[in-house]
């Protein structure tokens, strides 16, 4: 089964993140919400989401990563060195 990590940071766009997770899980993929900081992440519209994991090197074992938009969520992802490293890793 393919493993997909949806990376979340404070201020993520709830629709972009949660719709993706919903569709992928319905399609039979293992899809985990992964935070760059806390177990509970607040979206750009104030909805708090409990994630499955906190970012770690284990994410490199996944088949794909998804980076939802939203502000300041996208900026927070962009500014995190671990996320930059993962994007470069998955770009190979």
Model-inferred region functions:
Residues 1-91:
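Extended, subdomain-level signal for the structured scaffold at the beginning of enzyme domains
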